[in-house]
Amino acid sequence: MVLSSQLSVGMFISTKDGLYKVVSVSKVSGSKGDTFIKVALQAAGSDVVVERNFKAGQEVKEAQFEPRNLEYLYLEEDNYLFLDLGNYEKIYIPKEIMKENAMFLKAGVTISALVHEGIVFSMELPHFLELMVSKTDFPGDSLSLSGGAKKALLETGVEVLVPPFVEIGDVIKVDTRTCEYIQRV
């Protein structure tokens, strides 16, 4: 437990309504001299933000997370199936949590995840992945538009700009944060 006055941006709290990430915190003085802590909270697994007021000094339950390494296995309906490398249990992550990160997933990719009571709250891909080029533009098709680069479709369906010398079948390193070509492997 933490006091409401100790809440800070980035903390996770657990309430009777669910799990939340603290997005903003401000101290508000009431008309009768009492102080409240006004907090904007983002609901777990969604983009919904709600505002809550806590009395100054009120105890709030801080959510405890376990960092886990998960290996991607395959997509099953609307969930991505992962293997927890710590205890070898299967963990399902809904598409809503994966969002744009899903475009980099291929079997065997290991991600870092924060787990609370068996549920994945957030995840992070490795910063760099090596992916095979499955299709490219002809060098002349896109050179004039992109300053010497051409479009390449990778094995996971991601499209990136690559130098003209990259060909189908090449394995390239991609920055998953910016979706940019780094080098040919």
From Swiss-Prot:
One of its GO terms (molecular function) is translation elongation factor activity. It comes from the Bacteria. The keyword Iron does not apply. Keywords: Cytoplasm, Elongation factor, Protein biosynthesis. One of its GO terms (biological process) is peptide biosynthetic process. Pathway: Protein biosynthesis; polypeptide chain elongation. It holds the Pfam family Elong-fact-P_C. InterPro entries: Elong-fact-P_C, NA-bd_OB-fold, Rib_uL2_dom2, Transl_elong_fac_P/YeiP, Transl_elong_KOW-like, Transl_elong_P/YeiP_cen, Transl_elong_P/YeiP_CS, Transl_elongation_fac_P. The keyword tRNA processing does not apply. GO terms for cellular component: cytoplasm. It is found in: Cytoplasm. Belongs to the elongation factor P family. Involved in peptide bond synthesis. Stimulates efficient translation and peptide-bond synthesis on native or reconstituted 70S ribosomes in vitro. Probably functions indirectly by altering the affinity of the ribosome for aminoacyl-tRNA, thus increasing their reactivity as acceptors for peptidyl transferase. This is Elongation factor P 1. It comes from Chlamydia muridarum (strain MoPn / Nigg).
